């Protein structure tokens, strides 16, 4: 009973703070960026706006749920490859898009349809140039993704397309890997563990835990230029699967 009450209190406090911070933080961030945009180019204004979204996400995932939920981000990429990048991550929870705020880059995300329907957040995602791959033919998606990459904007994708119900790694869709082969930008696998129940699929209830995020080494075009999209997606999927197994093995040790 005591643990149940503690869990209820944690969730109540988190969601109250989440709503208050969103109602206050989003307008404040937007106003600051809008004011700065008067004196800078549209491109630099968009860069600041996208980074402001990341700062918002960092508060949501690191500050508000602490100390019940801890987020540990590790950059394991020693290649020093220049961006922009195509990030590909496994997908276990609705918290995954927020966790991508740990990446210290200007990014947009490839998302499903439902995030665009969220109040305020959906509008901000559209304004930032987030892409809904299910709402456009591949040619349009590829054109928009290529344009963003050419501007220096990294793209974050969840190629499983939907959250895993049991934590297992699903099959990958090939669209983003076709874009990679067309553009030649580096592909970086991202691995997330520990957030299966933060929150679990089908509920908004957050449970205490430690979330780990590993950014793996970049796969350069020279390494995959002879691949088909099918071969590339399977290679990336295997890299993610192997790292997740190692991460969870360490966690259980």
Task: Map each language-model feature to its residues.
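N-terminal membrane-anchoring alpha-helices
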Residues: 1-70
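Non-catalytic C-terminal accessory region of glycerolipid acyltransferases
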Residues: 5-8, 139-253
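Catalytic core of membrane glycerolipid acyltransferases/transacylases, capturing the structured
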Residues: 30-55, 66-67, 79-137
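Short amphipathic alpha-helical segments and helix-helix/interface helices
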Residues: 58-61, 100, 121, 145-146, ...
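Short gly/ser/thr-rich secondary-structure transition/capping motifs
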Residues: 66-74, 136-139, 195-197
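A secondary-structure boundary/capping signal
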Residues: 75, 90, 111-112, 158-159, ...
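Short amphipathic alpha-helix with an adjacent loop that forms part of the alpha/beta core around
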Residues: 75-80, 146-150
């Amino acid at each position: 009973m005591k643990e149940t009450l503690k869990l209820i209190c944690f969730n109540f406090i988190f969601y109250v703070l989440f709503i208050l911070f969103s109602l206050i933080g989003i307008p404040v961030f937007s106003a600051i960026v809008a004011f700065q945009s008067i004196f800078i180019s549209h491109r630099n204004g968009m860069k600041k706006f996208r980074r402001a979204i990341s700062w918002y996400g960092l508060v949501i995932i690191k500050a508000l749920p602490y100390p019940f939920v801890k987020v540990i981000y590790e950059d394991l990429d020693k290649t020093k490859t220049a961006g922009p990048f195509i990030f590909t991550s496994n997908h276990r929870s609705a918290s995954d898009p927020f966790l991508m705020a740990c990446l210290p880059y200007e990014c947009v995300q490839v998302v499903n349809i439902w995030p665009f329907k969220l109040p305020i957040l959906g509008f901000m995602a559209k304004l930032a140039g987030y892409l809904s791959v299910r709402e456009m033919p591949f040619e349009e998606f590829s054109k928009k993704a290529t344009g963003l990459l050419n501007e220096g904007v990294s793209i974050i994708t969840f190629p499983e397309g939907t959250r895993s119900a049991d934590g297992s790694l699903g099959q990958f869709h090939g669209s983003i890997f076709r874009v990679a082969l067309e553009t030649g930008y580096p592909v970086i696998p991202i691995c997330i563990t520990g957030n299966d129940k933060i929150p679990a699929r089908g509920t908004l209830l957050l449970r205490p835990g430690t979330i780990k995020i590993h950014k793996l080494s970049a796969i350069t075009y020279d390494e995959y230029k002879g691949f088909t999209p099918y071969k590339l997606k399977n290679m990336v999927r295997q890299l993610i699967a192997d790292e997740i197994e190692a991460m969870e093995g360490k966690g259980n040790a």
